[in-house]
Amino acid sequence: MKPIFSAEQRRAAYRILAALFWFAVWQALAMAVGQEFLFASPLKVLHSLLRLLSDPAAYLTALLSAGRIMLGFLLGAAFGILLAALSSRFALVFHLASPLVAMARAVPVASFAILAVILVSSRFLSTLIAMVIGFPVLYANVLEGIRQSDRKLREMAAVFQVPFFRRLVSLHLPHLAPYLRTGFAAAVGLCFKSGVAAEVIGLPRGTIGERLYFAKVNFFTADLFAWTVIIVLLSIVCAWGVLKLTDLCFSRLAKI
């Protein structure tokens, strides 16, 4: 006998039930606190979110912050991939890069942001912090992917003098694809969290960080939650776009 619901329908139902459960927990906490300015209810946050979505200035704010953070992601990804390639080829580069990567992973975002805001304009703070936080993720993933590649295939390509571009397209990149996708997905989320945190510290004009800080000091808790929802949505959309673009690039390369 065939099941009434397919596996996909059951998974969707579980997601909806999980979301409803946590919304109920949220509502219960809001009712327990009993003060909207301390802990806003889901309906209050939804009202604030709809108000923000009807404001053209909110879209400009979101695009400005997302653009700067994604620029930092791209710079960090490029630097991490290049450094990983060099580290896999030259032991000296690997040993020189190891302390840099360890520091970028261990030092708190606040410390980086406070130091950076002294040295650079607050307008570029989220870009710089996103780059610093994002590059170790891509570095580690790509380096691990290179180390896990088939050495015999690489040696055979060298023996038969396969051109570098052909080796890159047919051998190296297809193997690195899952490592890159995983790294991109993780790095985008980290870049948004760290980038917005840097904006809250540097307070560049017209950014999400500035709006969050304004909501905090004025106890506009519903707006604080609403902007947090927007940050999460921006992160999800940007990660989805990066992964789709990555898949498209690899599918095009496979046809070369």
Regions inferred by a protein language model and the residue ranges of each:
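Transmembrane alpha-helical segments of polytopic membrane transport and secretion proteins
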Residues: M1-L20, W240-I256
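Periplasmic/extracellular loop-to-transmembrane helix junction in inner-membrane transport proteins
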Residues: I4-A7, A32-L74
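Generic hydrophobic transmembrane alpha-helix motif, especially the helices
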Residues: A102-V137, E144-G145
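Non-cytoplasmic
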Residues: A130, G183-L233, L243
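Transmembrane-helix boundary motif in ABC transporter permease subunits
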Residues: L71-V101
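Transmembrane alpha-helices
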Residues: L128-V132, F165-A197, C238
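C-terminal transmembrane helix and the adjacent membrane-cytosol boundary/short C-terminal tail
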Residues: A91, P178, T182, A226-I256
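Short cytoplasmic-facing helical segments at TM-TM junctions of multi-pass membrane proteins
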Residues: N141-L180, L212
